[in-house]
Amino acid sequence: MEKTMLEQKLENTILPLLLKKELINKIISEKIEDENIIRDIISETVKSYERTLVEPNESVGVVAAQSLGEPGTQMTMRTFHYAGVAELNVTLGLPRMIEIVDARKEPSTPTMTVYLTEDYAFDKSKAEEVAKNIESITVQNIAQDIHIDMVKLAINVVLNPESMKQRNITADDVMEAIKKKMKLKIEQEGNILRLIIKTPSLKALRKRIPKVKSIHLKGVPNIPRVIVKKDDTMGEYILHSEGSNLSAVFEIDGVDMVRTTSNNIVEIQDVLGIEAARNAIINEISGVLNQQGLNVDIRHLMVIADIMTADGSVKSIGRHGLSGEKASVLARAAFEETVKHLYSAAEKGHSDKLSGVVENIIVGKPISMGTGCVDVYIDRDYEEGKDLMITVEKEEN
């Protein structure tokens, strides 16, 4: 059947535009010509769509909250290994769920899943090369020892030639990086770099050792480890990192920017935007639930992600986020810090329109949800007309 004829048949249905297009493409691809079959397909699709719609005035927020809260009580408090990568530890279970809904700026165990482009994804040596380019290398990684020379009152950095060769770093690179970060004189004796400060003292030298160890030489900052793992289903190599730095990783050759992601939702918002952050919230919560063997309809998670990102930035669900910013004074007071909210509202002369659920319950009024959203009254004209029809029927008989 032609596309235009199918469009005409679907024109007056309640199906959304994208669903109509998908249904048309399916019918055409399956080469269905029988009009009766097409009519039945459209009818069943419309019925299925109507069943998925939420009833008018349904409290979707409450349903979403209990649908996520109830499985949350069954979650474990422990931290598991990450999806078969024994070397990396990632927070899972209830602690991870709390991190997500609290919109923490930095997760307790930030990680990235780095996908590679086709040229690199199926070649192990190329994948390892990308991993080396990403992995952050500090002075500590290429030094055998870093200690204080008590005789000359200096810091001795004993370089490891093998580590430097593997990572393609020279002594000059190390000296240049140290000079950029610290104002001091450097003397080289073979594999030893002697760092001399202007006013040497034991206290001053001890204070500088941690800084020397953490000086960045190569790779992406904040990513101390990268592990290459082969995906058995796709046959491609995927990189798992400890630490997260999306914007810097995107600049490295061989990284697939479309699929690469992080578990740091606030970072995703800053780098990719609020829609990407919304998707990340859904995927992260869904991943936590699936790992625990808990099945929650994704639409509940979508409601939570929508409300967390509704005003263009990721906000937590709590007194410092959504609950603390409600328009209703009574709703804010009912959640936490009751006296503070009531004092503040009284001082500023705020009023409450009693438009939400909590505030109406507090004052003992019906809530504006479900049947509380509609008024019921008797249509007397209809009743009189009905009586008249019965009378007429009796006279005719």
UniProtKB/Swiss-Prot annotation:
Subcellular location(s) of the protein: Cytoplasm
An annotated GO cellular component: cytoplasm
Gene Ontology BP, a term: DNA-templated transcription
Gene3D superfamilies for this protein: 1.10.150.390
Catalytic activity: RNA(n) + a ribonucleoside 5'-triphosphate = RNA(n+1) + diphosphate
GO molecular function: DNA binding; DNA-directed RNA polymerase activity
Superkingdom classification of source: Archaea
Record keywords: Cytoplasm, DNA-binding, DNA-directed RNA polymerase, Nucleotidyltransferase, Transcription, Transferase
EC annotation from Swiss-Prot or TrEMBL: 2.7.7.6
Keyword Lyase: no
SUPFAM superfamilies referenced in this protein's UniProt entry, alphabetically: beta and beta-prime subunits of DNA dependent RNA-polymerase (SSF64484)
Function: DNA-dependent RNA polymerase (RNAP) catalyzes the transcription of DNA into RNA using the four ribonucleoside triphosphates as substrates. Forms part of the jaw domain.
Complex formation: Part of the RNA polymerase complex.
Family label: Belongs to the RNA polymerase beta' chain family.
Name this protein carries in UniProt: DNA-directed RNA polymerase subunit Rpo1C
